[in-house]
Amino acid sequence: MIDFGNFYQQIAKGPLSHWLNTLPSQLSSWQQESLHGKFKLWFNSLEHLPSLTPTTLDLNDSVTARMEPDISEGQREGIEKLLRNLMPWRKGPFSLYGVDINTEWRSDWKWQRVLPHISPLKNRLILDVGCGSGYHLWRMVGEGAMMAVGIDPMQLFLCQFEAVRKLLGDDQRAHVLPLGIEQLPELAAFDTVFSMGVLYHRRSPLDHLWQLKNQLVAGGELVLETLVIEGDENQVLVPGERYAQMRNVYFIPSAAALTTWLEKCGFVDVRVVDVCTTTTQEQRRTDWMITESLAEFLDPEDPSKTVEGYPAPVRAVLVARKPGIYQP
């Protein structure tokens, strides 16, 4: 099964060492009691992937691995078949020895919108909440992060991350743990915490903001990306049963309301740094994610609305800081 031993060793002598009081037993219980019905199938594909170390690795402009001399066509076909066993791939894209994983989301576009507005990630300890396949973790490593830790309870995403890691020379600068943020103690250890595409899935969004704050060091930075609507600080959309065909969407505030929420939770220096309508070029069906995507979730006669009649998805990026003096 998944071995978290390297992660335990890495955090044993740093600001996350106190996490070892609870984390190993949590993950041991998960492996014994909570595995998804398809986990063994996914893990089997992961085990059969070759361990490759790229001669060229680009994590700054993409997640791209190459080897000189190139791998054989047979090897490439075998890798692609195993990676396709881990579909659907939602966050990416990845280019691994000529296998191009064309994911549902152009997560690189989101990264381009976020990166200019945040503190440099060099030598920072980072938490990415709801990290999915871990695409952004690798981009954080590319920016010089000391370590990028992702959490996501979806076990398929863990297998996708470990598959990519295996093809990147078993790179130990990034890690994914199959946990939700509510399962984390108040670590107060991360220099930067990301929560992107999570807040609207939370029944209690203010509790989520408090949970994020509790993971930050004094003066640490929160990067929050979520759905928003137009309006003043009093405007919040509470959708009915579905929003853009998603059942689990609870609160979509205006950017102004979200700013107020962050301030109410004790964050300071709150900034709205980007607001962007999600397009069908950024989120779409591909041959690596073959089910419905954004185009099917919008009103075919008026793409400014969802099929339910709500405003179409608009996403904002906010940056805020936990009070205190930041000490790198």
From Swiss-Prot:
Q: Name one Pfam family in it.
A: Methyltransf_9
Q: What class of enzyme is it?
A: transferase
What keywords are assigned to this protein? Transferase, tRNA processing
- InterPro entries, alphabetically? CmoB, Mo5U34_MeTrfas-like, SAM-dependent_MTases_sf
At which positions is carboxy-S-adenosyl-L-methionine bound? 91, 105, 110, 130, 181-182, 196, 200, 315
Molecular function GO labels: transferase activity, transferring alkyl or aryl (other than methyl) groups
**Which reaction(s) does the protein catalyse, per the Swiss-Prot or TrEMBL entry?**
carboxy-S-adenosyl-L-methionine + 5-hydroxyuridine(34) in tRNA = 5-carboxymethoxyuridine(34) in tRNA + S-adenosyl-L-homocysteine + H(+)
Cysteine disulfide partners in this protein: none
Any idea of its EC number? 2.5.1.-
GO biological process: one example: tRNA wobble uridine modification
Query: What's this protein's family per the entry?
Result: Belongs to the class I-like SAM-binding methyltransferase superfamily. CmoB family.
What does the subunit section of this Swiss-Prot or TrEMBL entry state? Homotetramer.
- What does the UniProt record say this protein does? Catalyzes carboxymethyl transfer from carboxy-S-adenosyl-L-methionine (Cx-SAM) to 5-hydroxyuridine (ho5U) to form 5-carboxymethoxyuridine (cmo5U) at position 34 in tRNAs.
Name listed for the protein in its UniProt record: tRNA U34 carboxymethyltransferase
Q: Which gene encodes it?
A: cmoB
